[in-house]
């Protein structure tokens, strides 16, 4: 844990230096080390590096010729060696995929597996030392808990954070086919097209 806290502190120090240089502020967003809840600003500083933007290229052939379009969504870094989690519907029709990390680095991504029933997909990029997100359990949430969604709404507003509360838990939602229901978290944090696949954080990160 000490090594992990040190590595996280070093990343936050680099981020703070960039903020100071660009905005001329000395305000600190140091993450609490005593296990207490973070403020929204502290949470953003601690977690935004683990969130990625995903762009897919979709090619269609018809009697009128070949057309190319794009799809966009969000995701989060699962492991330091480049595994990324997103929603299946973000990537399933794409011919090629690009993952963009918070520092602007672009990686070609491969689809490693998908579960269309539960709308989950796993991608892989060739990288090491990536800042992985910390996974939690939805069973630990309570209605009224503050949460934050970080993602790429509308495919253009990368690294956007919105704040809200857990409005409901264990909401049964039917899939588009109607054959399966998925237990969902209900929140009033603003979520738009392009947020799909992105993480929902509690105030402990």
Regions found by a protein language model. Give the residues of each.
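Serine-dependent protease modules
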Residues: 1-204
């Amino acid at each position: 844990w000490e090594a992990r806290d040190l590595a996280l502190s070093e990343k936050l120090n680099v981020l703070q230096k960039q903020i100071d240089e660009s905005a001329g502020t000395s305000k600190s967003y140091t993450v609490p080390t005593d296990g207490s809840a973070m403020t929204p600003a502290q949470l953003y500083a601690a977690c935004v590096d683990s969130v990625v933007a995903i762009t897919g290229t979709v090619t269609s052939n018809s009697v009128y010729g070949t057309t190319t379009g794009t799809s966009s969504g969000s995701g989060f870094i699962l492991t330091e060696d480049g595994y990324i989690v997103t929603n299946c519907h973000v990537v399933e029709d794409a011919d090629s995929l690009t993952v963009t990390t918070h520092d602007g680095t672009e990686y070609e991504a491969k689809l490693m597996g998908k579960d269309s029933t539960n709308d989950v997909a796993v991608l892989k990029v060739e990288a090491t030392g990536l800042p992985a997100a910390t996974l939690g359990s939805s069973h630990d949430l309570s209605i009224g808990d503050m949460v934050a969604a970080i993602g790429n709404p509308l495919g253009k507003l990368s690294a956007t954070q919105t704040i809200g509360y857990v409005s409901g838990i264990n909401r049964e939602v039917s899939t588009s086919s109607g054959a399966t229901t998925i237990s969902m978290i209900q929140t009033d944090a603003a979520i738009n097209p392009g947020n799909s696949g992105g993480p929902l954080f509690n105030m402990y990160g």
